[in-house]
UniProtKB/Swiss-Prot annotation:
Keywords: Ribonucleoprotein, Ribosomal protein, RNA-binding, rRNA-binding. Belongs to the universal ribosomal protein uL18 family. InterPro entries: Rbsml_uL18_euk. The gene is rpl18. GO terms for biological process: ribosomal large subunit assembly; translation. This is Large ribosomal subunit protein uL18. GO terms for cellular component: cytosolic large ribosomal subunit. GO terms for molecular function: 5S rRNA binding; structural constituent of ribosome.
């Protein structure tokens, strides 16, 4: 139930907090620390990564990566916001940050809940594997999920049980010419392309 705006002590939260965009307490901590931030945001369609440095005049963007680039530049045929895409976007951002002289960052996951299996940690894992140092504590990362093996297994099972639902759920993959059962090998192909490009 929403708290009603009444009484002399009611305080309106800042606009960006009301919109679910900024956690001002965390923002304050980042500003005080003066460390370079590895910013991860995941929308309903995409994964967005930015590496930014705090500056009194505003954040200075050092490098960035967007999961839409995976399809446009590297031929990715899966969804742009699933776990493998999250890892690949993080890896791409990590390579670009290193290219610009960044070696260490702190993770800024915004208002994402740091729960087990959250895709934000797969983005960070991608950047770490690219060579960036980002402390994430004791978060467990499942390697089979990085490659999309869980998606491939589910697709294989669904195809044999309900082909109509299979075609509906994986329509984007199929339209792009990828059988979702082959996602792990496709992931490896795209990862190698990103490595070869150097970011």
């Amino acid at each position: 139930m929403n708290k009603l705006a009444n009484g002399p002590n009611y305080k309106v939260k800042p606009r960006r907090r009301r919109e679910g965009k900024t956690n001002y307490y965390k923002r304050y901590v980042y500003v005080i620390s003066k460390q370079t931030r590895f910013i991860v945001r995941i929308t309903n369609k995409y994964v967005i990564v930015q590496i930014a440095k705090i500056d009194p005049k505003g954040d200075i963007m050092i490098a960035s990566a967007h999961s839409a680039e995976l399809a446009k530049k590297f031929g990715w045929k899966g969804d742009e916001n699933n776990t493998p895409a999250a890892y690949l976007t993080g890896y791409l951002a990590g390579l670009r940050a290193i290219k610009r002289g960044v070696t260490e960052c702190v993770a800024d996951i915004g208002l994402h809940v740091p729960s087990k299996g959250n895709r934000v940690f797969y983005v960070i894992k991608g950047a770490i594997d690219a060579g960036l140092k980002i402390p994430i504590g004791d978060i467990s990362i499942e390697n089979d999920r990085i490659k999309g093996e869980h998606i491939a297994k589910y697709a294989e099972k669904l195809k044999s049980e309900n082909s109509d639902l299979y075609s509906k759920l994986f329509s984007r993959y199929l339209q792009r010419g990828l059988n979702p059962e082959n996602l792990p090998s496709h992931f490896e192909e795209i990862l190698n392309k990103i490595k070869s490009s150097g970011g």
